[in-house]
Amino acid sequence: IDFRSKSIQEGRYDPDVDEILTNQWSRIIVHLPYAFQGKRMFPDVFRHDRRNLPMWEKITEEIGPEPLPEDFLDTPEGIEQFEKANDSYRRLISKTEEFKEFVFQRIEKTQRASSLIGNQYTGSIFLALMSAVESDYLDGTEMESNRIGLCGYGSGAKAKVFEGIVQPSWREIASRFHLFERLSTRHAINKTVYEALHKGKRKKSVVKPNSEFALVEIGGEGKLEGQRRYEWVE
């Protein structure tokens, strides 16, 4: 909402003339603690952006009108009933062909790498971006000058929404990722090795670094306690 307001103030977006922002974005990159978080959280955004558009009439004809807070008693029980009804409606939205197509066009490529890796925490939004960019590169999709939306958020219920424009050099950069190729050559480890790595007991790398940054030390004391130091290893 804040991004939309700022876009209007700065002349970037005119809601009376321009297509809604989530349709302007060719790809929507979000923080993915698990692969399908993006598509599971987006029914609310999808509804918010479209409930006043003609296309929303077709959806309400299919799944019915959305539940509104004023239709329920202003009591703890009434609030709980509304939340349950809203959750059910969110699931109905996610099953419509319109929403499925939205996810396929704008979100699906962003979740491919995450589905092979898992939670990258603060790195997951960058992984989603790499996943989409490399997928478009491999598919031969023309993305130059397209806008992409990005959304980073945390457990404190705060989020930052911003957008980017794909630059002419994107193909040359994407060609150097080799993201999915590298993922296909990973080395599996067992539970014992994983726990030793997690607890910092294992000092030797499972796989010898090869032309990449490698963790060489976890420091020290005071403000530097837990600091992770990396070096480039040929």
Sequence positions of predicted segments:
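Terminal domain-initiation and capping elements
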Residues: I1-E234
